[in-house]
Amino acid sequence: MGRGAGREYSPAATTAENGGGKKKQKEKELDELKKEVAMDDHKLSLDELGRKYQVDLSKGLTNQRAQDILARDGPNALTPPPTTPEWVKFCRQLFGGFSILLWIGALLCFLAYGILAAMEDEPSNDNLYLGIVLAAVVIVTGCFSYYQEAKSSKIMDSFKNMVPQQALVIREGEKMQINAEEVVVGDLVEVKGGDRVPADLRIISSHGCKVDNSSLTGESEPQTRSPEFTHENPLETRNICFFSTNCVEGTARGIVIATGDRTVMGRIATLASGLEVGQTPIAMEIEHFIQLITGVAVFLGVSFFVLSLILGYSWLEAVIFLIGIIVANVPEGLLATVTVCLTLTAKRMARKNCLVKNLEAVETLGSTSTICSDKTGTLTQNRMTVAHMWFDNQIHEADTTEDQSGATFDKRSPTWTALSRIAGLCNRAVFKAGQENISVSKRDTAGDASESALLKCIELSCGSVRKMRDRNPKVAEIPFNSTNKYQLSIHEREDSPQSHVLVMKGAPERILDRCSTILVQGKEIPLDKEMQDAFQNAYMELGGLGERVLGFCQLNLPSGKFPRGFKFDTDELNFPTEKLCFVGLMSMIDPPRAAVPDAVGKCRSAGIKVIMVTGDHPITAKAIAKGVGIISEGNETVEDIAARLNIPVSQVNPREAKACVVHGSDLKDMTSEQLDEILRDHTEIVFARTSPQQKLIIVEGCQRQGAIVAVTGDGVNDSPALKKADIGIAMGISGSDVSKQAADMILLDDNFASIVTGVEEGRLIFDNLKKSIAYTLTSNIPEITPFLLFIIANIPLPLGTVTILCIDLGTDMVPAISLAYEAAESDIMKRQPRNSQTDKLVNERLISMAYGQIGMIQALGGFFTYFVILAENGFLPSRLLGIRLDWDDRTTNDLEDSYGQEWTYEQRKVVEFTCHTAFFASIVVVQWADLIICKTRRNSVFQQGMKNKILIFGLLEETALAAFLSYCPGMGVALRMYPLKVTWWFCAFPYSLLIFIYDEVRKLILRRYPGGWVEKETYY
């Protein structure tokens, strides 16, 4: 909103030209909103204003006229952003992403059951059960995800202010309190310190009125408001107050010139809610994964469909096989696993003060490669603090730490006594009542930020300011105004022969002009050229640190001329304001938060670029950027190089400067190519004096570079950028409702350092999801191969559908989820951000490891157990080939085994179901080893250790569940699972050990020969 966003700029969105009229219309509106505010009410004289809005500037509107306008324009409120209806959100959870795969599986199962029912008198119910279970899984998981997100949005709703705002209007000459929603254009409104401005106002009269525009323009200093037209730009002029900003002090009257969505604030909110938001990285990953799995499933299904036709099966049977293979490829439990893993991480992050609004944002933060951070309140403490003083011709450092543990200075000098007295007396800030037990730095004050900083500084170093003011009562005052740039007050002295002292503070150069002497070590000496140079050097040094500098002076008024009780006249000045005595300078800054420099350092080592985007002054922005390490030591901007070499800036090659400070007014005239060049060529960037539209353009610029962008902000002005970013991060304490609504994540403690924790959690969950998926997919092979051999070799079915479900939704679930708790293998904050093009959640190497290597060993273990049991019962492997048709024939009750014994149909089926149970138990045994090897992707399990208690519980839980399913009475009827001999459990042990040894050797080669053939082929 501030200083012009590039008018020639058109957002990336506009490339989709063919989207029909509606889309074009919307894009046109968004482009309009990206431009600056156009209004001319600030240029009108009061008479013209009254005529334009048909209002009496002293009595206000009539009640009838106000009613008519309200009926015409509607209430003075922002249209809430279009929210997604709850049923749509629920359907997204039910039919989005991974769920589609399971729904297709369920439909195919019902189709297969239908075909069988048409063909046979007594069809097997397996497919029916499977279809029902698949549908149930999707519905339960969908409800769970929906509940999680609904819970987060409930927390969001609680942020909304429950109190209806009131406004003081004057109608028909009467003052009345009404609901702010009933304010109309043309209303005469009065605001005072502490009020929220109810609409956009044109000021017609004011008394010392200051407003806090920080949520709109990012300027942390309160801005003076008066009836004069001072600037062409409506956002800069003094005679306009904006809707939803706060009046800090003083009073003002104004005419309402815009309400609701037509206000400047309303425009920003509309801009934010109209932006298109892209897919999250994890959603893209899951889409890619579904394509891979579907590809594998369809390839296998079609291959065996063709093969079974060649082998002479009827086409109906072949279709049943096709469906069976596709369904067997669907990892039923994975959807639930991913959801639970993300939820667990979201809960962990909430404990560390990051509230994640939607689960997918958890991982987005981990892939972030650029953070565009606001300055005020995120990188800094959001409280002005006295940083330095200059008196007795030297600079003293004050304590700016959050817990007052920093530097101290010598307070014995009589000059400091005088300086502290002026700072305490020439000061209108006061502590709010009832805070005696709170430490001074944490107390709330009434008054502007700079005065509050002085008040706290003096209270900390000299004791009670209230007592000081009681001893020196104020008898006259000229408040600060923009023309003379000083504040002056006169106090009676109780502790001195002089009856009055005049104290003054203001812009240092203005104060110095009024002085003829200077106080050094308590003595007044003439203000000569040498002292003026010393002042100039100190002023430049403190200003160069990005600090706000104030000058202080005093004059002891002679008692003869000004006796006690003298009437001072502040309009027709009857006292001197020249030839004063200069005492010193004090400078203030909003200091960096303690944890930020460390957090910025961590981002740098994690390969994340931190860009500062602020509405503040370039010098201040650069000073804070250097203070927190966004511009690191030794890195120079073009201006720094020019100053060092003593040459004009135009002669410096911009590529030599690693750091860069861009002014909003320069950004306004840049083409998108020039912006891209800055973002590409400089590693450390600060944007100062930017408007909200420019913030949005910077985010879009970073995204054009292929970066995954996180944006932090607290003001309403940040909401378009928050919405556009891959992940928007709002501030929980200082943030406005609009910014929280637009963000994906909320920092409950407003601390930049919490973002770094979030990045770490996000990277960890991506690694752990990989492990979880690798673990889950591996058991697909021992589940599919029995079915394939059943088709090709015509053997009795080694593993039934129901037992597959017991693995996917029973024994595998807890172990897969337990991998979410696995600690990081190495320092994940020391590596570069993930490249979303190359580093996928599931890649071909993961599939080849899970399916082609570990899965195959598992299948061997299962078949070994299967053949052992059938051989013990008399069916040697050679007898089993081609036996399937007789085996499954209900009428054959005299089937001979290898030793000539005859078996009835029922007896055969009991042996077959016992094989199913044993195959299932074997998969559980080999999955033990799979779980342990999935703990790490590169390290040895012995380096990682078994510290993950949930994982140990998972191992015990899957074993206990398998034993329960095998030995519990009644399982033979319910799930057709039969008790096993103890020895049968041990058949798969050698295979389990083989998996463990095979993988440990592979990881050893990975560590010995990084980048070698083994890594290229098997490191996922």
Curated annotation (Swiss-Prot):
Entry annotation: catalytic residues: 374 (4-aspartylphosphate intermediate)
Enzyme class, UniProt record, top EC level: translocase
UniProt superkingdom: Eukaryota
Annotated propeptide span(s): 1-5
Ranges of the Cytoplasmic topological domain: 6-85, 151-286, 337-769, 821-840, 936-948, 1004-1020
Phosphoserine carried by residues: 10, 439, 450, 496, 559, 587, 672, 826, 940
PROSITE patterns the record matches: ATPASE_E1_E2
Any Gene Ontology CC annotation: caveola
UniProt KW keywords: ATP-binding, Cell membrane, Ion transport, Magnesium, Membrane, Metal-binding, Nucleotide-binding, Phosphoprotein, Potassium, Potassium transport, Sodium, Sodium transport, Sodium/potassium transport, Translocase, Transmembrane, Transmembrane helix, Transport
Region called Interaction with phosphoinositide-3 kinase, residue ranges: 80-82
InterPro entries xref list: ATPase_P-typ_cation-transptr_C, ATPase_P-typ_cation-transptr_N, ATPase_P-typ_cyto_dom_N, ATPase_P-typ_P_site, ATPase_P-typ_TM_dom_sf, ATPase_P-typ_transduc_dom_A_sf, Cation_transp_ATPase_P-type, HAD-like_sf
Modification Phosphothreonine, positions: 570
Sample GO molecular function, one term: protein-folding chaperone binding
Region (Disordered): 1-31, 212-231
Disulfide bridges in this chain: none
The keyword Protein transport is assigned to this record: no
CDD domains: P-type_ATPase_Na-K_like
Catalytic activity: K(+)(out) + Na(+)(in) + ATP + H2O = K(+)(in) + Na(+)(out) + ADP + phosphate + H(+)
Compositional bias annotation for Polar residues: 212-227
Keyword match Flavoprotein: no
EC number: 7.2.2.13
Residues noted as binding Mg(2+) in the record, renumbered to the chain: 714, 718
Membrane topology value: Multi-pass membrane protein
Quaternary data: The sodium/potassium-transporting ATPase is composed of a catalytic alpha subunit, an auxiliary non-catalytic beta subunit and an additional regulatory subunit. Interacts with regulatory subunit FXYD1.
Classification via PANTHER family: SODIUM/POTASSIUM-TRANSPORTING ATPASE SUBUNIT ALPHA, SODIUM_POTASSIUM-TRANSPORTING ATPASE SUBUNIT ALPHA-2
Designated name of the protein: Sodium/potassium-transporting ATPase subunit alpha-2
Gene that encodes it: Atp1a2
